[in-house]
């Protein structure tokens, strides 16, 4: 079976995750970013772990996925959402990490690091994106992939819509990174 389809066809997934699949297309995202069995992956601001959990299913027992939560998100969720997820849906290769967006505290030597639907949050939360991006590149292996997926704002808007409608202009992110 296709490893990307297999990642979302696993029975032990929350119904809320399964309901997001048609719009979020995690199998296509993980394929696009070339996540493979045995990879070491990090996700910045992983929220409740939707993409991290799917990535953990692809990397398998030989791989590791580090799902980052910031102190702000832990306060907002009244606890670490990744730890809460793991209590109900255990994945032995999914590890919660805590740190600021600028320095997520990933171990060195990751193959891929994702920022999924949260790059715009780094803008409105006033995170130092230069430090964040440099931290990512310092953590990746040579040739590693920094995958950013976010809602695209209309051309010319830059960062103007990051807080109100949670959009950021694609060309702005490409230039900045």
Positions of predicted regions on the chain:
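S-adenosyl-L-methionine
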Residues: 77-104
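Conserved class I S-adenosyl-L-methionine
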Residues: 37-47
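Class I SAM-dependent methyltransferase Rossmann-like catalytic core
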Residues: 2-32, 36
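Glycine-rich SAM-binding Motif I of class I
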Residues: 49-53
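A short acidic, Gly/Pro-enriched loop at the edge of an enzyme's catalytic core
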Residues: 102-114
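Conserved Class I S-adenosyl-L-methionine
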Residues: 158-176
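A short glycine-rich, Lys/Arg-flanked "PGG" loop and its adjoining helix->strand segment in the class I
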Residues: 56-57, 128-142
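Conserved beta-strand signature within the Rossmann-like core of class I S-adenosyl-L-methionine
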Residues: 143-151
């Amino acid at each position: 079976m296709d490893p990307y389809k297999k990642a979302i066809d696993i029975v032990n997934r929350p119904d809320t995750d399964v309901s997001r699949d048609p719009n979020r297309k995690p199998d296509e995202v993980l394929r696009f970013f070339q996540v493979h069995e045995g990879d070491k992956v990090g996700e910045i601001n992983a929220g409740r772990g939707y993409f991290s959990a799917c990535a953990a299913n692809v990397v398998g027992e030989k791989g590791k996925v580090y799902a980052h939560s910031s102190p702000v998100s832990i306060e907002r969720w009244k606890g670490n959402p990744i730890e809460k997820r793991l209590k109900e849906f255990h994945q032995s290769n999914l590890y919660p990490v805590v740190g600021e967006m600028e320095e997520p505290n990933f171990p060195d030597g990751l193959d891929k690091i994702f920022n999924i639907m949260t790059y715009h949050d780094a803008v409105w939360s006033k995170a130092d994106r230069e430090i964040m991006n440099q931290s990512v590149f310092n953590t990746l292996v040579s040739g590693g992939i920094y995958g950013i997926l976010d809602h695209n704002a209309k051309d010319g808007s830059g960062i103007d819509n990051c807080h109100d409608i949670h959009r950021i202009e694609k060309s702005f992110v490409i230039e900045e990174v």
